[in-house]
Amino acid sequence: MKVRAFLAVDLDEGLRDHVSRIQDTLKSADAQVKFVEPENLHFTLKFFGDVGEGKLRRIENVVRDTLRGYEPFEISIRGAGVFPNPRYIRVVWLGVENPETFSDLQRSLDMEFVKMGFRPERDYVPHLTVGRVKGPRNRDKLAELIGELQNVEVGSMRVSEVSLKRSELTPAGPIYTDMEVFRL
């Protein structure tokens, strides 16, 4: 049986309230945005899609081997932004200040995943997705609010583990379940 899987760093629980307040500010635009539930907030390192049991075991081994070269590290979450651009907003995110270690970790993992047949990530930017735009209503107001939040400081957290997660899509939204948690 295949599962929809991805590799991620969970947002520190102590920062969820602050992110929820930022989401509340963005909700005031009354735009067509599906906001990420606080318990689902994470930094994606790699989305695998549907993978079978054998490939999951290989992914786990690659992650375990790669993480041996890393110690826990701190990141600061700061600034709101969008993908792909402010004129056509699809994703609203919060960024990572000084993301070098985070980006290096992602690159190291991705190089190994490419050897397994996964597509390489292009132009990876460490970010915390806070919402996905579903329609055009009040997009200008949303863009204005995001602009006002471009320097917002969320806080710092220690990255000490990476989670291999299952994503189950439901009408109420995705349900994420940890399949394996790896310590740095």
Curated annotation (Swiss-Prot):
It catalyses: a 3'-end 2',3'-cyclophospho-ribonucleotide-RNA + H2O = a 3'-end 2'-phospho-ribonucleotide-RNA + H(+). A motif (HXTX 1) lies at residues 42-45. Its EC number is 3.1.4.58. It holds the Pfam family 2_5_RNA_ligase2. SUPFAM superfamilies: LigT-like. Belongs to the 2H phosphoesterase superfamily. ThpR family. This is RNA 2',3'-cyclic phosphodiesterase. It comes from Methanothermobacter thermautotrophicus (strain ATCC 29096 / DSM 1053 / JCM 10044 / NBRC 100330 / Delta H).
